[in-house]
Design a protein with these regions (language model features):
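N-terminal low-complexity, intrinsically disordered segments
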Residues: 1-62
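Amphipathic protein-protein interaction modules
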Residues: 62-117
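Short secondary-structure junctions and interdomain/linker hinges
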Residues: 22, 29-33, 50-57, 75-78, ...
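A recognition module on extended beta-rich or small alphabeta surfaces enriched in W/G with H and D/E
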Residues: 98-147
Length: 147
């Protein structure tokens, strides 16, 4: 059975650090976006440039996946009102963003979402995924209003 818990102060601090690192990542791999607020478009450009650079060092790959994933999760939290949580199941615990708890449960694991795209070397997916998730959240919200 899945267990959902709010994040603690340490986890909130780690998220903040990842967002700071995501901004630095964009500065390094998409210089034209440097000095501007972090956007999914900028993250898409930086991630595509980084993937094209052929990274192979495991610790660096994991770090970048976390930077980009956490920034994606924060965009979902900021834009759609989802909340950061720790989701635990029989496979372990991970950071996720949650919407409509107990009423439809939208649960997105943003770092895992990015990791799967990294495995396929897929790029330019963040903005489109955000649009799709926005549509899904809107559909659930409309269904909740009807019932």
């Amino acid at each position: 059975m899945q267990k959902i818990e709010p994040i603690n102060e340490k986890e909130a601090g780690w998220i903040k650090a990842q967002l700071n690192n995501a901004s630095k990542f964009v500065e390094g791999f998409s210089p034209s976006d440097s000095g501007h607020p972090l956007t999914l478009a900028a993250l898409d450009r930086a991630f595509a440039a980084w993937v094209a650079s052929g990274p192979s060092e495991t610790d660096l790959v994991n770090a970048i996946v976390n930077y980009v994933g956490i920034a994606f999760g924060q965009a979902l939290a900021d834009g759609l009102g989802l909340k950061w949580v720790i989701a635990t199941d029989d496979r372990g615990s991970d950071l996720a963003v949650l919407g409509f708890p107990e009423q439809g449960d939208i649960l997105v694991y943003p770092a895992n979402f990015v990791a799967k795209r990294w495995e396929r070397r897929e790029t330019n997916f963040l903005e489109e995924a955000y649009r799709q998730i926005t549509n899904d959240v809107g559909a659930i919200a409309r269904r909740r209003q009807i019932s």
